[in-house]
Curated annotation (Swiss-Prot):
Induction field: Repressed by abscisic acid (ABA).
GO cellular component, one term: nucleus
Domain of life, source organism: Eukaryota
Highest classification ranks of the organism: Eukaryota, Viridiplantae, Streptophyta, Embryophyta, Tracheophyta
Binding site for abscisate: 76, 104-109, 131-137, 156
Subcellular location: Cytoplasm, Cytosol; Nucleus
GO molecular function: abscisic acid binding; protein phosphatase inhibitor activity; signaling receptor activity
Other remarks on this protein: Plants overexpressing PYL3 exhibit abscisic acid (ABA) hypersensitive phenotype during seed germination. Plants overexpressing PYL3 exhibit tolerance to cold and drought stresses.
Region (START-like): 40-191
Protein name listed in UniProt: Abscisic acid receptor PYL3
Primary location recorded for the protein, binned into one broad class: cytoplasm
Site keyed Involved in interactions with PP2Cs: positions: P103, T167
Motif (Latch loop): 130-132
Cross-referenced Pfam families: Polyketide_cyc2
């Protein structure tokens, strides 16, 4: 886990947040992505953090899954059902049902930003029976090369209220664990699709 500073002003104000990854070092490009796209301003009663995942699949494939605001169950293992009316556009609201075993059953979520050029997805929780109040996330998708092949770096950051009775660290660790599961599943689904595409006959 790496501590990432949010700039001199934020450091002076005592605001620090982490970027959690399987690796303990960040390349300059990754740090630049965080600085450029993942700008949160947590208040005293909030915490903010991020997770990253390197996926052995091209950006266009990974983004095609991520951008489906209407079908988060494509790669999110804790989602059992999702309903959304209308087209996928900024302001769209989805009703998500959560699988049993988690301290929640449903979540109402609004699409804040969907940028197909920069590959940015931002979502805010606006209701539900969970404890993630004022939760807002930013997910970005970036091209990279892994083992000489097209790959993808996915970074997801968030800010959320710290529930009464919990610490900032406890809240961050809980949310980070959920996001890591989501990104691990995203990697598995994406990489399976790559293998499938490579093994399908050319005359299909």
């Amino acid at each position: 886990m790496v501590e990432v500073g949010g700039g001199a002003a934020e450091a002076a104000a005592g605001r620090r947040w982490r970027l959690a990854d399987e690796r303990c070092d960040l390349r300059a490009a990754e740090t630049e992505y965080v600085r450029r796209f993942h700008r949160h301003e947590p208040r005293d009663h909030q915490c903010s953090s991020a997770v990253a995942k390197h996926i052995k699949a091209p950006v266009h494939l990974v983004w095609s899954l991520v951008r489906r605001f209407d079908q988060p169950q494509l790669f999110k293992p804790f989602v059992s059902r999702c309903e959304m009316k209308g087209n996928i556009e900024i302001g769209s609201v989805r009703e998500v049902n959560v699988k049993s075993g988690l301290p929640a059953t449903r979540s109402t979520e609004r699409l804040e930003l969907l940028d197909d050029n920069e590959h940015i997805l931002s979502v805010r929780f606006v209701g539900g029976d969970h404890r993630l109040k004022n939760y807002s996330s930013i997910l970005t998708v970036h091209p990279e090369v892994i083992d000489g092949r097209p790959g993808t770096l996915v970074i997801e950051s968030f800010v959320v209220d710290v529930p009464e009775g919990n610490t900032k660290d406890e809240t961050c660790y809980f949310v980070e664990a959920l996001l890591k599961c989501n990104l691990k599943s995203l990697a598995e689904v994406s990489e399976r699709l790559v293998v499938k595409d490579q093994t399908e006959p050319l005359d299909r």
